[in-house]
């Protein structure tokens, strides 16, 4: 097993109405939900404030791609949001494959006995936890950070 880089990471699940935010502990052992941020003109500013509050070393943004690996309707939106975060935060921002993270989040919430209506406010946070945990697992097993770095000031390809 490879030792992870030390430091808090934020996980971001970008949606049209809400953005789920999760974080790791400094040792990268555990991902936990933080909050659901309304998707509006202030969402990037709020996430940057959260990153500062937790002294995050990097931000991981879920990239919604289809099971076949093709872009989805939400892929360009996530890339644009990641670019805005990279510019505003000055932190490394990485796009990570989030296939099935929201499906896994819904399943976990159903198994915990929550109705879909009650889950709506936290499903984005849980999806952020899932994508962050997957990224930690990739780094732990490969020795390399998951995903692709987003250059600040540019929308990634």
Please report, for each region that a protein language model flagged, where it lies by residue.
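Phosphate- and other anionic-substrate recognition elements at nucleic-acid/protein interfaces
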Residues: 1-12, 16-157
């Amino acid at each position: 097993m490879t030792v992870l880089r030390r430091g808090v990471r934020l996980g971001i699940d970008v949606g049209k109405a809400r953005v789920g935010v999760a974080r790791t502990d400094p040792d990268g052992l555990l991902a936990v939900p933080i909050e659901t941020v309304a998707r509006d003109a202030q969402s990037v500013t709020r996430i940057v404030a959260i990153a500062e509050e937790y002294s995050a070393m990097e931000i991981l943004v879920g990239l919604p791609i289809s099971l076949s690996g093709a872009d989805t309707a939400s892929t360009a939106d996530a890339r644009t949001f990641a670019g805005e975060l990279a510019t505003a935060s000055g932190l490394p921002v990485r796009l990570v494959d989030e296939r099935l993270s929201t499906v896994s989040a819904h399943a976990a919430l159903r198994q915990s006995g929550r109705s879909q209506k009650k889950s709506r406010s936290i499903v984005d946070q849980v999806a952020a936890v899932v994508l962050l945990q997957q990224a930690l697992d990739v780094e732990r097993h490969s020795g390399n950070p998951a995903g692709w770095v987003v250059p600040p000031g540019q929308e990634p390809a």
